[in-house]
Swiss-Prot record:
InterPro entries: ConA-like_dom_sf, GH11/12, GH11_AS_1, GH11_AS_2, GH11_dom, Glyco_hydro_11. Keywords: Carbohydrate metabolism, Glycosidase, Hydrolase, Polysaccharide degradation, Secreted, Signal, Xylan degradation. This is Endo-1,4-beta-xylanase 3. It comes from Penicillium parvum. Residues 1-19 form the signal peptide. Optimum temperature is 55 degrees Celsius. Belongs to the glycosyl hydrolase 11 (cellulase G) family. Endo-1,4-beta-xylanase involved in the hydrolysis of xylan, a major structural heterogeneous polysaccharide found in plant biomass representing the second most abundant polysaccharide in the biosphere, after cellulose. Efficiently hydrolyzes different xylans including beechwood xylan, birchwood xylan, or oat spelt xylanand; as well as xylo-oligosaccharides (XOS) except xylobiose. Xylotriose, xylobiose, and some longer XOS were the main hydrolytic products. Xyn also partially degrades xylotriose to xylobiose and xylose, and the longer XOS (X4 to X6) are also efficiently hydrolyzed. It is an enzyme of class 3 (hydrolase). PANTHER family: ENDO-1,4-BETA-XYLANASE A-RELATED. PROSITE patterns: GH11_1 (PS00776), GH11_2 (PS00777), GH11_3 (PS51761). Transmembrane segments: none annotated.
Amino acid sequence: MFSFTSVIALLSAGIVASASPTAIEERSLTSSSTGYSGGYYYSFWTDGSGNVVYNNGNAGEYSVTWSGNAGNFVAGKGWNPGSERSVTYSGSFNPNGNGYLSVYGWMTNPLVEYYIVESYGTYNPGSSATHKGTVTSDGGTYDIYVDQRVNAPSIQGTATFNQYWSIRQQKRVGGTVTTANHFNAWQKAGLQLGSFSDGAYMIVATEGYQSSGSSDITVH
C-alpha cells in the first residue's frame, strides 16, 4: 500500500456488501457475496481487479487464494450481528506482500469500523494512524490506533466515521481473541463505542491488497 489513507479507502470499500445475507449458501465464489454457510455468517467482497477465489467450507471453515498482485478483497466468516464474544479460530495465513488477518466488523450509533489484527504481511496498518496506547490480552500486547474516514463507504452507505484498531505486536495465526478486552481498552482510551445493530457484523477476516497468497481459517 502506498499510504494509510489510500489503503483504508480501498479496504473500507470491502464492506459495502449488503448487510442482509442471501438465503442461498454458496461454496466457491469469485464475485462479491454475503450469506450464511455452515451456521455462520460470511462476507466476501472483491473489487474484481485481481484473481481471488473464496471457498465456504464446512461449519466455520473458509479458504481464500489470491494472485496477480492487483486488487483488494475482504473475506471471512463470523456473526451478524456481532457481539462482545470470545472468538476462537485456527488455520493458516500466508500473504506474499500486503495482507491482514483480523477480527473485523462494525458498530452503529455511532458508526464505527474496527479491526483486531492478529497478523499482517509487509504493511503495518497502524503506520499513519494515531496511537492511543496498548492493551494486553490473550497472551499478547496490541497497539491501539484511531483514524477517521470522511465520506467513505460503510454499511450505512457513504458516511464519516472512526476506525479503531488493535494490532498485535507478536503476530500469530490461531488462538482466542477476547473482544471485550479490546472494546473496554478503546473506551478507556477515550474512543466512543457503538452498538451491534443494523447489520453490524463481526467476522474473522482475511484481506489482501495488491499481493498474492492463501489463507485457510476455521472459526470455532
